[in-house]
Amino acid sequence: MTHHETSAVDASSASMHVRSTIDVPPDLVVGLLGSADENLRALERMLSADLHVRGNTVAFSGEPADVALAERAISELVAIVASGHPLTPEVVRHGVAMLVGTGNESPAEVLTLDILLRRGKTVRPKTLNQKRYVDAIDANTIVFGIGPAGTGKTYLAMAKAVNALQTKQVTRIILTRPAVEAGERLGFLPGTLSEKIDPYLRPLYDALYDMMDPELIPKLMSSGVIEVASLAYMRGRTLNDAFIVLDEAQNTTAEQMKMFLTRLGFGSKVVVTGDVTQIDLPGGARSGLRAAVDILEHIDDIYVAELASVDVVRHRLVSEIVDAYAEYEEHDLGMNRAARRASGARNRR
């Protein structure tokens, strides 16, 4: 790939404009631009510099900083295509967002890290924070993954668990959740205990079937290699040589969280995931996830990975919905505080 030096267009104006060009290897142009130029359009929407493509040459013009960002974006996207990974508008958006956010990391390195491959489908991190989260799982025995819905915290943890089993780093996978959800308590639901708990574990089953051969899963579950169970079934056990994922951990009590973490045995790894803004515990009880992070985050070999709305990898509207609700709840909290202060002032008169 050839880069031609930038040249000043209007050096006398208050805001200098520059131009530059990059020659893309001819065999990579189609992959870079995408079907019907969909990748180019996604790139143009995210960049302030003007982009023009002629043959295998990409020309840029605009403010120096904008052109520099566009040049680096093209270079990183070309590297992704050259590595053999498919480039999509979603990958373009995540790559440019990464450059805008920090500029210190290579999107090509982050977005081409394969965690798990199955039947042509690849699981890989799509944001810088997801990459840091995955790296933390590799480097630590216990990792807390905290973030809103759609940030991939559970899916990536399960992908790492399946990979660890396939590469014989562990001999079994244990997936667990507390059986508490908004608006429902198990005692009021019909059916046996197993029938009551199963719907709460369904998201874990869904992810598992997405990552492994469906016909293999029942055999692995019947032999105990894979276990999907309510958190209550963890009590009194020591879990050796296992990859253990606790999902929806914000709905554990402090006692449950302590019980769970002390199940850790030799050769095991634990990933705890949750969203501290979605606590469904009755009576305003303090979340065991919050307590655990406060108590344990300074301990070596325990890592707290925080993901945010910028890491949401579902439909683009999901991140906007997450931000809108956070803003509304912050405003609502401020209004309630103001009302309490006003009420207190009246009572003191």
Swiss-Prot record:
One Pfam family matching this protein: PhoH
Binding site for ATP: G147, P148, A149, G150, T151, G152, K153, T154
Disulfide bond listed as a keyword: no
Keywords (A to Z) from UniProt: ATP-binding, Cytoplasm, Nucleotide-binding
GO cellular component: a single term: cytosol
Subcellular location: Cytoplasm
MF GO annotations: ATP binding; RNA binding
Entries under InterPro entries matching the protein: KH_dom, KH_dom_type_1_sf, P-loop_NTPase, PhoH, PhoH2-like
UniProt record similarity statement: Belongs to the PhoH family.
Annotated protein name in UniProt: PhoH-like protein
Classification of source organism: Bacteria, Bacillati, Actinomycetota, Actinomycetes, Mycobacteriales
